[in-house]
Amino acid sequence: MTSYSFTEKKRIRKDFGKQRSILEVPFLLAIQVDSYREFLQENVDPAKRTDHGLHAALKSVFPIASYSGNAALEYVGYKLGEPVFDERECRQRGMSYGAPLRVTVRLVIYDRESSTKAIKYVKEQEVYLGEIPLMTENGTFIVNGTERVIVSQLHRSPGVFFDHDRGKTHSSGKLLYSARIIPYRGSWLDFEFDPKDALFTRIDRRRKLPVSILLRALGYSNEEMLAEFFEINTFHINPDEGVQLELVPERLRGETLGFDLADGDKVIVEAGKRITARHIKQLEASGIAALAVPDDYIVGRILSHDVVDASTGELLAQANDEITDEQLQAFRKAGVDAVGTLWVNDLDRGPYLSNTLRIDPTKTQLEALVEIYRMMRPGEPPTKDAAQNLFHNLFFTFERYDLSAVGRMKFNRRVGRKETTGEAVLYDRKYYGERNDEESKRLVAAHGDSSDILDVIKVLTEIRNGRGVVDDIDHLGNRRVRSVGEMAENVFRVGLVRVERAVKERLSMAESEGLTPQELINAKPVAAAIKEFFGSSQLSQFMDQNNPLSEVTHKRRVSALGPGGLTRERAGFEVRDVHPTHYGRVCTIETPEGPNIGLINSLAVYARTNQYGFLETPYRKVVDGKVYDEVEFLSAIEENEYVIAQANALTNADSVLTEQFVPCRFQGESLLKPPAEVHFMDVSPMQTVSIAAALVPFLEHDDANRALMGANMQRQAVPTLRAQKPLVGTGIERAVARDSGVTVNARRGGEIVQIDAARIVVKVVEEEIVGATDAGVDIYNLVKYTRSNQNTCINQRPLVQVGDIIARGDVLADGPSTDIGELALGQNMLIAFMPWNGYNFEDSILLSERVVEEDRYTTIHIEELTCVARDTKLGPEEISADIPNVSEQALNRLDESGVVYIGAEVRAGDIMVGKVTPKGESQLTPEEKLLRAIFGEKASDVKDSSLRVPPGMDGTVIDVQVFTRDGIEKDKRARQIEESEIKRVKKDFDDQFRILEAAIYMRLRSQIVGKVVNGGAGLKKGDVISDAFLDGLKKADWFALRMKDEDASEAIERAQKQIQAHEKEFERRFADKRGKITAGDDLAPGVLKMVKVFLAVKRRIQPGDKMAGRHGNKGVVSNVVPVEDMPYMASGETVDIVLNPLGVPSRMNIGQILEVHLGWAAKGLGRKIQAMMEAQAAVADLRKFLDDIYNHDDTNVANRVDLSQFSDEELLRLARNLTDGVPMATPVFDGATEAEIKRMLELADLPSSGQTQLYDGRTGEAFDRHTTVGYMHYLKLNHLVDDKMHARSTGPYSLVTQQPLGGKAQFGGQRFGEMEVWALEAYGAAYTLQEMLTVKSDDVQGRNQMYKNIVDGEHEMVAGMPESFNVLVKEIRSLAINMELEDN
């Protein structure tokens, strides 16, 4: 049984889930918040910081040594300062929210003359390294005043990967295998086979070289290479004839010998027969050590070593030569006793490296290095040093090459090593063994005999030989998540490396000129790199702020695109497809439709990343068929070894699996296993899906395509005026609302002492007060009518009343689209599935007028309009109400400064901010000259460039902000705004101080009442303080009391100190705020003044608006019908929405039907509760009825509601909140069954079929058959007809073609395109067509003439030459073809 919090007791969802919750839904923004916290390590003691984030980046670049080595700059530590502006101020002023980064560095200068590098002097100093953006507590960044989200990236993990070309390269369809070593940063190293089975290597995808060149450059000789990759057969040469083979029976398998193979007289294999496994067993049993074979058995085999005549030193044959008859005789003649040959065959021991050596032109290490140099730097003359340095820098220096911890772990696992740690560079025993520097010696000592490059080639040749498998690059064990912190670290490191180059050059000057660290380091490159990343990286996105769900989903998004990722064009089908390893890690449903499908995914509900960045998902442990509550997180790699049962596998009361065979997953396959073989079990049925998909009730009854649309469209729902909780939900709504950050949650428990629309004050309970200075008062300021990124309205409303007792985490105020702390994206509408006069053809939606009347889908949109006054060449622009040629009426909404009043209702075309721009002297017409002579100069030297309301928009002005550049006098309106803002802040601080003070005095009263005094404040020694005495005493005189009790004296002293401390603190904060408000603003260059006007636009639902349910059932409103014409039930209740029943069967989203049935039951139960309340039934009866609703089903122990926890008062409050309908939760994949839905309908006294008789509102006649009726949570999406409808009469024209511009934003026209022209041609409408192509488009003279004609009342047109024809002529002339028009 759960105990309920204050908020949860207000309204409880009936939960149909059968599984009890093992794991609470985790904090949904953890992937963002934790990642960035690890990057900053802000509140970590500098000595204890781990190798992550800023600390790691600074450590990797420093120390920086000068070229001579006589000066070095070392890193000591860093700290982050306080941000100058808080989040709200940054949003308002268009600033970035960040803190200054100060790094402590130490400059060490060594004595040149000394041989032991003695230190000459040391200087330590703090250096400013730019601003580091800070993350808000909701996981966003504020960049230039807008909220942005850095989306996590799913990229290929560093490490080594083996693959083949799927037979596409060569016409024969032969599989060509390849390997690729991918570092975290540095050059890629590829190995690949060609069709002739030679092995090649490529560096950074350049020209390929035989792999032996790379090995030779590492220092291996031919003999060493062959010894590494082949086993060797030894032949002893008889002096006269024949050869003895040292026999390893296994190596003969599959061969056909040209002679009998015998053990003494017993023939084991006859000549010409193939040797099988049985023969080999007989050979092993016989114990034959050597086998006499004829000469032709050894001829044609490949030598493993050079063969030298011992007496003369003459080279008889080289390693990798095929032995010829002549050479064999030469060996005999020179008395060579034994030779080694490579054991190769065509089956599973291919001669790949041997083939490669034959095409390798190089002989020495230097030649190989030069060859690599030529390939990397074609056209540059190679020198020995240059070639060696280039090769070393490619893979063997940490500055240029970094496998990273992940890469090393993946590399070692793939080549079959035990340890998961190692060097970040590639290690090779031969290469480092031949070098003498300290670092090389350290590496050799640490890693001894291993070799990374050789190991990769060995695994690759094994795969080519048929042993081993290639990797699946779409497996989530080979793709990892790069989150904000890691990306920021990489960008920061890039900036530091740029700084490093500059510092190196200046350090040589520092030796001689005594520069300080501050003069050495220029922070600009670091700041620029960070600014560029947060401002314009592909993964830094404008936050989707339509509603709380869209915010949460955006932060949990995982993208395969972006820098270092895929591109849409190159991504094939495999990458986009659902992979078995997505289960529980990435949502298999939610992904965009369109070109990004499958490339952008959402994290599953319980998924998290591990230390390496791989996604993990939780499972419950199962031992011998018993399921435990212990939870373990497994990554895709670890999961491969286990058998995993589903969350809804049947268990008995003791949590033992009861089925004989349990449905399981194992290595990506679904199969049945006995309980004893099961290792783990899912924690929850919704483990596979993301937050958005987990919000769709009855998801298990919807087709996946429609579920995808449903999940995506919930993110587009616009918050309505009054949010309404979904009657049928899934139980996860509360978690989404809580973590989205739109609600206000209590930081600490306590009592509500003061409340208004904009502020809630909580007196904290004693247990949660920390430290002596803590006054025990929490003040929550609410967000009122603010604009979101998508222009929707963000507003918070208090939910609590004075005197309420709350606990930590309780919801104090609702935000947009939340209802008592639950996500509420739409409205519960009464829906009927039936055709109605063709108005719901093709998914159209028929609405009742009542929906519009009751403002059910009325939404508020806040538009921000900006007017900027610049300094122009002809003089400054001016914001004023004195505008030429504008009527008084047009100016009646402006104040004397030329800015619109707050509260003014404006329509399209109205002036909001008056602005005039100086215009150049032009040639005056005689009329203008006359006017000038009469009225003086002023009238014409400025033109009107006021800010007007854009077409198609009307609303109410709710806020105006005026920004003035520093050093320019503020106008009256700006000063007014400033004064009112200072007043507001002052009042805020005064209120806060008063509340704190009252709380302190109250606490003090409880500590001194009833205590004895020694005197003071008019009391005698031995008097006892009473409540009445304190009430009559002035507050300031309390501190004059001298107490007998030591503790009471301390309490008085402490209270006095607290009040003084708070007073000082508030004064400081107020002065700080005041300074910020009165200071001039930092505006863009050339801008003198900027006015922002915020318009609240009310949008009622109307035909053309898009609406949708949660099951992908979307449509467009076709008509709004009077209430009296809508179908109605026998009770006289009319339906709100009529949907087309034909939209259901073909789309296979049956979830909507079940939702409608259950929603009807929920509403019916609410009505029954309301009837009981109105009849003033006994509380006991009410309790029994509620118990019947929540706890009827005895089998469902998991989700019983313990009503005994509720007092009668709480029960009545609960019942009042249920009268609008009893909310139900039907969790994904664990939802209500048909029987349960029927039971709920019966309990609500509704037909269990879910259908009822409807009557036609126009005629009153009953319809022929019963209709499915019920309540569905229906959303209005942010695709409103008001934003899309657009018409143009005259407007702007394109400069070159003189044709009207296109698009609503440019106030453009509709293109009369190619096909439309064909249509007019087909009808022979020649004059209409001529008009379309000339005067209505780009015949400049023609359209001017036509305007004059219309003004003069003549209705005729003269079509001239379209401007685009002139453009065409000019184009042709630019190709040097003259084309002239003749008058005809």
Curated annotation (Swiss-Prot):
HAMAP family: RNApol_bact_RpoB. This is DNA-directed RNA polymerase subunit beta. PANTHER family: DNA-DIRECTED RNA POLYMERASE I SUBUNIT 2 (PTHR20856). It catalyses: RNA(n) + a ribonucleoside 5'-triphosphate = RNA(n+1) + diphosphate. The lineage of its organism: Bacteria, Pseudomonadati, Pseudomonadota, Gammaproteobacteria, Lysobacterales. InterPro entries: DNA-dir_RNA_pol_bsu_external_1, DNA-dir_RNA_pol_su2, DNA-dir_RNAP_su2_dom, DNA-dir_RNAP_su2_hyb_sf, RNA_pol_bsu_bac, RNA_pol_bsu_CS, RNA_pol_bsu_protrusion, RNA_pol_Rpb2_2. It holds the Pfam family RNA_pol_Rpb2_1. Belongs to the RNA polymerase beta chain family. It is an enzyme of class 2 (transferase). One of its GO terms (cellular component) is DNA-directed RNA polymerase complex. Its EC number is 2.7.7.6. Disulfide bonds: none annotated. Keywords: DNA-directed RNA polymerase, Nucleotidyltransferase, Transcription, Transferase. PROSITE patterns: RNA_POL_BETA. GO terms for molecular function: DNA binding; DNA-directed RNA polymerase activity; ribonucleoside binding. The RNAP catalytic core consists of 2 alpha, 1 beta, 1 beta' and 1 omega subunit. When a sigma factor is associated with the core the holoenzyme is formed, which can initiate transcription. One of its GO terms (biological process) is DNA-templated transcription. DNA-dependent RNA polymerase catalyzes the transcription of DNA into RNA using the four ribonucleoside triphosphates as substrates.
